[in-house]
């Protein structure tokens, strides 16, 4: 589908719903930049003007399948060796149960729609509505984590009220590149962008709560308005 043009959701492409499983192990920000070149509305698809759709399965689906298969293989191997230790059997059976539970709970397809024509978002699981609300409740956020040695890593997360946080890119040490990509995604989807700090002039707020409705996140001074060009995604 050409960039920037409306089109129907590629329902024939099963892999489209698994795109968030592959975030890139090395240079994750470059991996995301390549995806944005192929689809400037990533991870969404522009179904029609001002309407963006994202269909996906949780990555706990493949993790549960992997745990289930490994546990079943180990149970079979232990049976052949006639292992009688109760602790071993309890651990393996527990792995089978947890793996099966993860698979079953992750099988329902998720669907998130950003409808700027109506000014609302809609989130459903297997066709059943979970929540819907105004667009100021949906955002792209830069998140921060650190390891035991004090090294900082940044993640880009798509989140919102009663939405499952979706990691778009993770474990990058390059703040400027991650900020640029986060702002780019938020601008293309026309949603809010928030820095990893709760109060920051780097927030970009495009949608405010209606008067008297309260706020989910504290108001912050606006600053560093994104460049209107932002055509290059070389990072």
UniProtKB/Swiss-Prot annotation:
Major localisation: membrane
Membrane topology: Multi-pass membrane protein
Keyword Transferase: no
Residue spans, topological domain Cytoplasmic: 1-67, 106-235
InterPro entries, per database record: TMEM249 (IPR027861)
Transmembrane intervals: 68-82, 94-105
Summary of subunit composition and partner proteins: Component of the CatSper complex or CatSpermasome composed of the core pore-forming members CATSPER1, CATSPER2, CATSPER3 and CATSPER4 as well as auxiliary members CATSPERB, CATSPERG, CATSPERD, CATSPERE, CATSPERZ, C2CD6/CATSPERT, TMEM249, TMEM262 and EFCAB9. HSPA1 may be an additional auxiliary complex member. The core complex members CATSPER1, CATSPER2, CATSPER3 and CATSPER4 form a heterotetrameric channel.
Protein name per its UniProtKB record: Cation channel sperm-associated auxiliary subunit TMEM249
Organism from which the protein derives: Homo sapiens
Name of the encoding gene: TMEM249
